[in-house]
């Protein structure tokens, strides 16, 4: 297998984004570039030079419709969703099946193709008390989900009998997929279209992710690697809300946890699938 470098990886991700964008345009689905991708569009008109992923987010109704339509994407682009067999993430990914991406090579490695992350956005209750309770519940189950991926298995191997028994019980009750379904149900409790504040509830930091829907709509289009993609109309306020007031300082970008330049990935073309990317 031939190893794929950062620049080629970015081009493959861009090709996935272009296919996704074409399908969203065809069916009038709303989406917005997000995270490091949005910051890159604002400050670099493309990838932050060392960034190795693309993030987009969609209102929940569009996200669920997209899942039904994803079969129309090119054959080599596969939709990956949380399932009983594989539930390491809480959101959708579009992966290039011609490639192999190994995250954290070694004991805790995870394998997929080169991918683009697609996050669903949900509504927040307007009432402050309800919002606090809602976020508390989400945070509790999010912590349980991430604990279920590793810690319960470790507990089962403990020398301490009590810890070992707890690990066995928790591993049966709190399976990752069961916790994902609980989180998804919680996140959808306040419908996106009926709320004035929205955000990414199922993953990340829902407290910081909360913002007025007016920051999103109507979308504006920003330059990214020679193409224009939809972004929140209040993208500057949105980025400052999430990353702080230093977003235009390019030196500061090296310190942002979601786009650190030391991601531990190994990426390859699968034998016989080595094809040049479109430019």
What are these regions (language model features)?
Residues 1-25, 67-126, 144-244, 249-279:
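Conserved catalytic core of two-metal-ion nucleotidyltransferases
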Residues 21-54, 58, 63, 214, ...:
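Active-site nucleotide-donor binding segment shared across nucleotidyl transfer reactions
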Residues 128-133:
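A short secondary-structure junction signal
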Residues 135-139:
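Short, His- and charge-rich active-site/binding loops that engage polyanionic ligands
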